[in-house]
């Protein structure tokens, strides 16, 4: 269960939650539909200019695969080592509910070709990719759900935390204006509901109809039968059409059904947050988050899973700090003393190769055989979880090297050590 998609996403969250408990650090990586819609950033750009360029030229592309590798330190019988838990998520902004944003995005042909050449499964991305709702969209959709329920039920108490400017007049107090072309349909529904109320059946299933017709049915029946009935929308077995079920209820039952339905829809909104739940779990763990040349990864993660990017680098750093309090870039680390002379080339593959040579000693790392592909024997460069895995391996190796400067030398340096502080949040 290495590649996590819709069917097993909740199982992945359980595994991730367990792995995050008492872990040492987390490594991340992303794959994108493109890199730059214009020119690449200049080599002499200031950090502020680089941020502005990336913000303006990259955010129309999507992060479509998120790799997360969680490293948990365990003292082995023969030395010191880590257990690594790699998670690979396909990410696609599917409109999982009616009020969710219907996103547009760019693709860069060279980037798509590159991903295909490395085995990226676009069928899995589009068919089973995990969606997401940012915190801003989550609140907006919840407000829309609450307003709609309050309008249908004529009950302002259902608006627990909606906008104070929202006015919820009871639909029962307003005449329903039914367009001429829909009057025969509504008249037939009213006749059937009238016969139902005069009978003894517990429920009445109406014929499938359009969303607008359902709205008219709700408003009309609510107006003519303000009490004693509860209306709910269901989906046909083939999931192609929707219809209304009318039930007899007491006022107490009606109120509880309305509250239960509202809560279920609010829970669905939280469920639709999708990959944002992964971000939240990592953020709440407070662990060091490691990436390689990670500026672009962080920009996309903030933009897609948190909210709109601010205008300035200072504001962006503040935004990132609210989510990831401790970030470490292995490329920056490799370009900083005492590593600078040891890494003439700082690409991720080159970094990995150098970490296998003196004076470095890679720590012993194992991957659980159940639920995870063993990256220790299977190289899959440019699969996000694999790149996150080797990024974490490089970081652990470089961190341990710092221990050789201590007196006496230490074979392992923790991510929380003071020796790591100079490389954080750069």
What spans do the regions from the language model cover?
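Entry/capping segment at the start of metal-dependent catalytic domains
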Residues: 4-63, 67-69
């Amino acid at each position: 269960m290495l590649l996590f998609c819709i069917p097993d996403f909740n199982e992945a969250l359980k595994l991730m939650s367990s792995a995050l408990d008492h872990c040492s650090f987390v490594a991340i990586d992303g794959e994108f539909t493109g890199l730059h819609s214009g020119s690449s950033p200049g080599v002499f750009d200031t950090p502020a200019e680089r941020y502005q360029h990336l913000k303006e030229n990259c955010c129309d592309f999507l992060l479509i695969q998120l790799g997360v590798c969680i490293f948990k330190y365990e003292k082995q019988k023969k030395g010191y080592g880590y257990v690594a838990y790699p998670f690979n998520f396909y990410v696609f902004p599917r409109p999982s509910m009616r009020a969710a944003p219907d996103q547009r995005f760019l693709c860069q042909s060279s980037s798509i070709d590159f991903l295909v050449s490395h085995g990226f499964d676009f069928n899995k991305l589009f068919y089973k990719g995990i969606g997401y709702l940012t915190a801003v969209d989550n609140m907006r959709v919840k407000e829309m759900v609450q307003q709609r329920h309050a309008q249908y039920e004529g009950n302002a108490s259902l608006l627990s935390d909606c906008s104070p400017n929202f006015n919820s007049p009871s639909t029962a107090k307003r005449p329903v204006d039914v367009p001429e072309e829909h009057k025969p349909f509504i008249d037939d529904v009213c006749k059937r509901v009238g016969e139902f109320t005069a009978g003894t059946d517990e429920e009445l299933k109406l014929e499938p109809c359009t969303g607008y017709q359902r709205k008219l049915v709700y408003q009309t029946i609510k107006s003519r039968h303000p009490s004693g009935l509860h209306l709910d929308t269901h989906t046909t077995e083939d999931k192609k059409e929707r219809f209304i079920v009318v039930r007899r209820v007491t006022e107490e039952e009606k109120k509880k059904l309305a509250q239960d339905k509202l809560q279920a829809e609010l829970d669905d909104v939280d469920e639709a947050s999708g990959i944002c739940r992964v971000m939240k779990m990592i953020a709440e763990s407070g662990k060091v988050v490691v990436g390689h040349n990670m500026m672009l990864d962080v920009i996309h993660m903030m933009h897609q899973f948190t909210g709109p990017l601010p205008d300035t680098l200072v504001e962006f750093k503040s935004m990132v700090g609210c989510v990831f309090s401790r970030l470490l870039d292995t490329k920056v680390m490799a370009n900083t003393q005492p590593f600078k002379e040891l890494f003439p080339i700082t690409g991720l593959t080159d970094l990995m190769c150098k970490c296998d040579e003196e004076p470095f000693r890679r720590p012993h790392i194992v991957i659980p055989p159940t639920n995870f592909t063993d990256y220790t024997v299977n190289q899959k460069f440019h699969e996000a979880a694999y790149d996150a895995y080797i990024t974490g391996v490089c970081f652990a190796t470089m961190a341990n090297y710092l221990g050789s400067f201590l007196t006496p030398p230490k074979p392992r340096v923790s991510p929380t050590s003071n020796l790591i502080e100079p490389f954080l949040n750069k």
